[in-house]
Amino acid sequence: MNNHATVQSSAPVSAAPLLQVSGALIAIIALILAAAWLVKRLGFAPKRTGVNGLKISASASLGARERVVVVDVEDARLVLGVTAGQINLLHKLPPSAPTEEIPQTDFQSVMKNLLKRSGRS
């Protein structure tokens, strides 16, 4: 009688499915990041609104941690010097004249303009 059992080793698992899934995941993440950048770049992202009537209307960087900021308050516009340690009032301006509401553009017209600029229309 033959009491010897033969052990068969299975074929090594290939890395192709792992690479395929990893590639698809990286492509999806890149697509999400590109869409977020495009939304921010084209202005579809909601505008940041200030709290309690404060709105930053302009900002300029002067150094690594220094900025000059123009803040609209209810009855004045303040020019502030902002550093890492403190905020100083540089100048007080009269309130700005009310501006006309900028009409919201729809997605279709933005895409048409974008395609016209790239020459694909």
UniProtKB/Swiss-Prot annotation:
Chief location: membrane
Membrane topology of this protein: Single-pass membrane protein
Under the heading Pfam families, the entry gives: FliO
Q: Where are the transmembrane segments?
A: 19-39
**Subcellular location field:** Cell membrane; Bacterial flagellum basal body
Q: Which InterPro entries match?
A: Flagellar_biosynth_FliO, FliO/MopB
Q: Which UniProt keywords apply?
A: Bacterial flagellum, Cell membrane, Chemotaxis, Flagellar rotation, Membrane, Transmembrane, Transmembrane helix
Indicate yes or no for the key word Aminoacyl-tRNA synthetase. Answer: no
GO BP, sorted A to Z: bacterial-type flagellum organization; bacterial-type flagellum-dependent cell motility; chemotaxis; protein secretion by the type III secretion system
Query: Gene Ontology terms, cellular component aspect?
Result: bacterial-type flagellum; bacterial-type flagellum secretion apparatus; plasma membrane; type III protein secretion system complex
Q: Which residues form a coiled coil?
A: none
UniProt lists the family membership as follows: Belongs to the FliO/MopB family.
Q: What is this protein called?
A: Flagellar protein FliO
Highest classification ranks of the organism: Bacteria, Pseudomonadati, Pseudomonadota, Gammaproteobacteria, Enterobacterales
